[in-house]
Amino acid sequence: MNHGFLPISRKEMEERGWNQVDFVYVSGDAYVDHPSFGHAIITRLLEAHGFRVGIIAQPDWKDKESITEFGEPRLGFMVSAGNMDSMVNHYSVSKKRRQQDSYTPGGVMGKRPDYAAVVYGNLIRQTYKKTPIILGGIEASLRRLAHYDYWSNQLKRSILLDSGADLVSYGMGERSIIEIAEALDAGLDIKDITYIDGTVCKVKNLDSVYDAEILEPYEEMKKDKLLYAKSFYRQYCNTDPFSGKRLVEPYSDHLYVVQNPPAKPLTQQEMDDVYALPYMRTYHPSYETAGGVPAIREIKFSLISNRGCFGGCSFCALTFHQGRIIQTRSKESLIAEAKTFPEDPEFKGYIHDVGGPTANFRAPACKKQLKYGACTNKQCLFPKPCKNLIADHKEYLSILRDLRKIPGVKKVFIRSGIRFDYLLADPDDTFFKELCQYHVSGQLKVAPEHVADPVLQMMGKPENAVYERFTHKYEEINKRLGLKQYLVPYLMSSHPGSTMKEAVKLAEYLRDLGYMPEQVQDFYPTPSTISTCMYYTGVDPRTMKPVYVPKNPHEKAMQRALIQYRNPKNYDLVMEALRIADRMDLVGFDEKCLIRPRKLHSEKMQEKNGYSGRNHGGTHGGTDRKSKNPNGNSKNPGKTNGNYKNPNAGHKNTKPASTGNGRGESSSRPQKKKSIRNVHKRK
């Protein structure tokens, strides 16, 4: 019997003396009773309000009996695909099946279906025809209205219509789920619960729907992508809990999907209360024989300090899910949780993270947001920081200092990600200094994403000059501290707006940096982001202007290969990309070249027999070491590899790439293999 955990079987329910639960929570993730998991927060919150909850984690979707473990619940079913969209969880951007599921015991893949929320909803409806079904979690939240689905390459209907569910609780859900539970407990029919903020419902007519904005009809959007772009941007402009309007999406047969305004953000006291619930902070013991749940490793000794993000990245869905208004826990709440870590025998003295979507956002962007909401017509940081932005790290710094003082804590890391433009906007460098001194272990990961300003513009990221300022300041601070620490940039290929020209520019940047990433993130069109809308429609929904979109798999492979141009396996792709970009000047023996030209078969045979045309002044294949013109009969025969600016221009503190064999190795002497520590290293 595990009284510490909520029941996961009829036996455990009966051991509690219950003959029925109020709600059955069906989850695509294994049961992990930790506040990093949405199912843990919602079920514990319901428990705190007096409701009896049973959990069915990862039911067998091929067997409808798998969701009858507790029988019919008194009030309803709650369904979530898990902490991730099930399709992102299952497939890479190239649509290849992933090998591991970190949210499943033993990391085993295949324990949940594709489109899990839809499958679970219909599975329940087969047996329980009239029992209320409420969808929640990120999959339902980001698919609550018509949305582009990358995996099927089509515009899909609201998840509410395909799942057999009655309501969607979108966003973080604490406020709406308690209101729904109390309404059902009071005897209201689920069809009459159409008024709760943070929910989406379906109706047959609009007689009881007031102050609503009518979106483009689904059937028309399927025929015209530009109509979808307009609808999406209207949705985007109504994600604020203070200014957001009620939205109505018409469907055929006089059916309407109604999105109520977002729920109001939690107060700090409410946030503290949520994270003070009696979590077991680990996975259910029944998973022990399978090796546990891998996802717990990184989050077990991490602290969630905030929610929301006003960064405004185009490829991120946080605006649709958590909103732009920052919600935080108090210092006292964070310290109290951290003091429990040393009591765990698995704790080694390291707090893995103190953050959230963005670690260094600890307050709303400006004073007006908690009263009037975030601006609908402009961003807080993009393209430049707003004049009303309050960039202040004092409170966050105070929290980190107190965490370092806790007995048994050796090191406090920050791994959520630092928003470097916000950091630079703070006139006080104290946090920056202490970040380098105490919270970085050799390398700091940051996300410039790209270096070409046209691509950064589409991404909603600051121009590259801002990142350059950050790198120089980071180096200066570490030098003053006597530390050798480096930056590891996260970079993205094939984002809308990235032509082959911009992709080559990114490769040149990495060449000057002397760094080749081990992994490359190709743009992934996930539901409900501005970038995904660009990918599907070919226009920027903010301006309705056309955007170049790299969609062809081969072109995407070339852009990805350019980031790892030193990898011999990528040679042909890089060569093809350089031809397309009209940059054959980057093929040769100069230190600025990305790859060397390949020898012709006749030249290889001569060298094999002891004759080297190059050693005798020949120019086999149009390559002359003296003239350094590898282009032969290319489009730019007169362009040589010697015509370059200072190779370290703009990167005086970074190590330039070595020259040679296409992998960055010297042709005259062996070079030390590049490692992650070469990033932003001084000469």
Task: Give, region by region, the residue ranges found by the protein language model.
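Flexible glycine/acidic-rich beta-alpha junction loops that bind and position SAM and/or redox cofactors
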Residues: D85-S94, L142-R144, E174-E179, K204-D207, ...
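Glycine-rich beta-alpha loop elements in corrinoid/cobalamin-binding modules
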Residues: G38, A57-S252, Q259
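Conserved, mostly hydrophobic/aromatic
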Residues: D166, V274, C309, L334, ...
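Conserved SAM/AdoMet-binding glycine-rich loop
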Residues: W18, Y25, I56, D60-W61, ...
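Intrinsically disordered, Lys/Arg-rich low-complexity segments
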Residues: K604-M605, N609-K683
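N-terminal pre-triad scaffold of radical SAM enzymes
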Residues: V26-D29, A290-A317, P342, Y350
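Amphipathic alpha-helical packing elements
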Residues: I159-G171, A561-M605
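Terminal amphipathic helices with adjacent charged low-complexity linkers/tails
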Residues: K62, K191-F242, A263-L266, V293, ...
